Amino acid sequence: CIRDRPNPTVSNVKAGVEAFASSGADFILAIGGGSSMDTAKAIGIITNNPEFSDVVSLEGVADTKKKSVPIIALPTTAGTAAEVTINYVITDEQNQKKMVCVDPNDIPSIAIVDAELMYTLPKSLTAATGLDALTHAIEGLITKGAWEMSDMFEIKAIEMINRYLVTAVEEPSNAEARNGMAVAQYLSLIHISEPTRL
């Protein structure tokens, strides 16, 4: 069991790779928000592509050859859609910067999005992750790769966030609002996975 932290670091990932190797496990179970998903993706990719000795060598578009260790993702937030995207963000403590790693081989094998797992998320995090999804949707509309089909998803995401976010914050156990936000955050990140190839 690896307990990651917000904004996972290179050293978190290194510790996770070592823990996974010594565990004898066949898969990684990632439970939490975007940071948990990002940590799991980095651990899974490095484990199956040991020529990349640490996550720093994966910054940018990674040239891995093998798919990640199987990852089962159970998100507890609705904001990053990290459970279904090809990128992850890790903090390089030594150089004091965040690294974006892009790799189609890192997508979790299974993503189980259950709104009930989000019921106990504090109001402040519900709001913050919801605004993260909104930011991603707006970004998707203005990115160079946007086109009519990706715009359709981003506009729908913005409409759903407008409809459900306040209710999800004010009524944390409202299933309709939580499900709506779970779908909206997914739609808001579709542009990350190659918007011109939808």
Stretches found by the model and what they are:
Residues 2-4, 190-191:
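Short, low-complexity export/processing leader segments characterized by acidic and small residues
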Residues 3, 29, 39, 73-74, ...:
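General beta-strand structural signal in soluble alpha/beta enzymes
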Residues 3-51, 167-178:
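N-terminal small/polar loop signature for handling phosphorylated ligands or for N-terminal nucleophile
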Residues 5-8, 35, 122, 126, ...:
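Catalytic cores of large soluble enzymes that bind and process phosphate-bearing ligands
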Residues 12-16, 24, 39, 130-133, ...:
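General structural feature for long, well-ordered alpha-helical segments within catalytic domains
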Residues 33-37, 79-80, 197:
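Gly/Ser/Thr-rich loops at beta-strand to alpha-helix junctions
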